[in-house]
Amino acid sequence: MLAPKKQKFRKAHKGRVVSKSKAGTTLAFGSFGLKSIDGWRVTARQIEAGRKAATRCMKRQGRLWIRIFPDLPVSKKPAEVRMGKGKGNPEFFAVRVSPGRIMFEIEGVEEDVAVKALELASAKLPVRTRIVRHYE
């Protein structure tokens, strides 16, 4: 799974996704991409599940790029622990995905295969998405 090698701080603020994405809104590598419509927090496990689903559908042909990286540590308190006594320990990593952000890109397969692969990847993600093409 994706995780940062080094971090400046162990814990991060919860934060919100408030604005549209300014960078990463156009296709840079592939001919087909998966663009977010909602703003949401996507975990490293969800990204990995989407990657596996897409590569399995493509039968390991072509190329897949992941354009988001989970660098936000999400902390959680253990089960049945009372409120207070500080913030919990980091459990997993996530990324805040803004509306308009390209998350996955595909190149080197036919359009119907690419669309099917991106639909399968989209089903694994908590954000609403749409498929974009390079010639649009």
From Swiss-Prot:
<dbReference type="InterPro" id="IPR020798">
    <property type="entry name" value="Ribosomal_uL16_CS"/>
</dbReference>
<keyword id="KW-0694">RNA-binding</keyword>
<dbReference type="GO" id="GO:0000049">
    <property type="term" value="F:tRNA binding"/>
</dbReference>
<dbReference type="InterPro" id="IPR036920">
    <property type="entry name" value="Ribosomal_uL16_sf"/>
</dbReference>
<protein>
    <recommendedName>
        <fullName>Large ribosomal subunit protein uL16</fullName>
    </recommendedName>
</protein>
<keyword id="KW-0689">Ribosomal protein</keyword>
<dbReference type="GO" id="GO:0022625">
    <property type="term" value="C:cytosolic large ribosomal subunit"/>
</dbReference>
<comment type="function">
    <text>Binds 23S rRNA and is also seen to make contacts with the A and possibly P site tRNAs.</text>
</comment>
<keyword id="KW-0687">Ribonucleoprotein</keyword>
<dbReference type="InterPro" id="IPR000114">
    <property type="entry name" value="Ribosomal_uL16_bact-type"/>
</dbReference>
<dbReference type="Pfam" id="PF00252">
    <property type="entry name" value="Ribosomal_L16"/>
</dbReference>
<dbReference type="GO" id="GO:0003735">
    <property type="term" value="F:structural constituent of ribosome"/>
</dbReference>
<keyword id="KW-0820">tRNA-binding</keyword>
<dbReference type="GO" id="GO:0006412">
    <property type="term" value="P:translation"/>
</dbReference>
<dbReference type="InterPro" id="IPR047873">
    <property type="entry name" value="Ribosomal_uL16"/>
</dbReference>
<keyword id="KW-0699">rRNA-binding</keyword>
<comment type="subunit">
    <text>Part of the 50S ribosomal subunit.</text>
</comment>
<dbReference type="GO" id="GO:0019843">
    <property type="term" value="F:rRNA binding"/>
</dbReference>
<dbReference type="InterPro" id="IPR016180">
    <property type="entry name" value="Ribosomal_uL16_dom"/>
</dbReference>
<comment type="similarity">
    <text>Belongs to the universal ribosomal protein uL16 family.</text>
</comment>
